Swiss-Prot record:
Organism for this UniProt entry: Xenopus tropicalis
SMART domains, alphabetized: LAMTOR
InterPro entries: LAMTOR1/MEH1
Region described as Disordered: spans on this chain: 1-54
Lineage: superkingdom: Eukaryota
Post-translational modification: N-terminal myristoylation and palmitoylation mediates its recruitment to lysosome membranes, thereby promoting localization of the Ragulator complex to lysosomes. N-myristoylation by NMT1 is required for palmitoylation at Cys-3 and Cys-4.
Compositionally biased residues, Basic and acidic residues: 10-22
Tagged with keyword Ion transport: no
Biological-process GO terms, alphabetical: cellular response to amino acid stimulus; cholesterol homeostasis; endosomal transport; endosome organization; lysosome localization; lysosome organization; positive regulation of MAPK cascade; positive regulation of TOR signaling
Cysteine-cysteine disulfides: none
Subcellular localization(s) per the UniProt record: Lysosome membrane; Late endosome membrane
Protein name as it appears in the record: Ragulator complex protein LAMTOR1
Keywords: Endosome, Lipoprotein, Lysosome, Membrane, Myristate, Palmitate
């Protein structure tokens, strides 16, 4: 932003507007004691006008650098426009979320052991064991597929309620 006076010299680093002096170095405001403030303003009107001119320049420079964000967004947005936009956004969001349901997240693999490197480094499972497990799974599948329920009597019994 700026400073009134600094003893540091400009090294050329950073933003030039940051190092720029708001008050010229040749002019400095006189130091006033608390009791002298009223006397100086009445005795020296030219000093007061110089101060006013410097202050007005500082205010003008500051006003140029300020961006009022609240005024920018609120230009012309009425309530029905906000409601229309909200409806439009919600329909778009509903379309996107329905598309996301198709892409179900694949569950991660279960963690069967805390040391998978030992399992991967061990000997592979023998082929005979794999055949035995496959045969048992086939028998279990055929047994489950042959289960039938035969209805021998009615499941709902009518009571003699008139």
């Amino acid at each position: 932003m700026g400073c009134c006076y600094s003893g540091e010299t400009d090294t050329g680093k950073g933003d030039q507007g940051e190092r720029e002096h708001l008050l010229p170095q040749s002019q400095s405001l006189p130091n006033k004691a608390p009791n002298e403030s009223e006397q100086n303003s009445t005795n020296n009107p030219s000093a007061r006008t110089d101060e006013q001119a410097m202050l007005s320049r500082i205010l003008a420079k500051t006003a140029q650098n300020i961006i009022d964000v609240s005024a920018v967004e609120s230009q012309g947005m009425e309530q029905h426009e906000c409601m229309d936009r909200a409806r439009q956004y919600s329909t778009r969001l509903a379309k996107l979320s329905s598309n996301l349901m198709d892409w179900k997240k694949v569950p991660p693999l279960p963690s069967l052991t805390s040391q998978p490197h030992q399992i991967l480094a061990s000997d592979p499972v023998p082929f005979a064991d794999i055949q035995q497990v496959s045969k048992i799974a086939a028998y279990a599948f055929s047994a489950l597929s042959q289960i039938r329920v035969d209805a021998k009597e009615d499941l709902v019994v009518q009571f003699g309620i008139p």
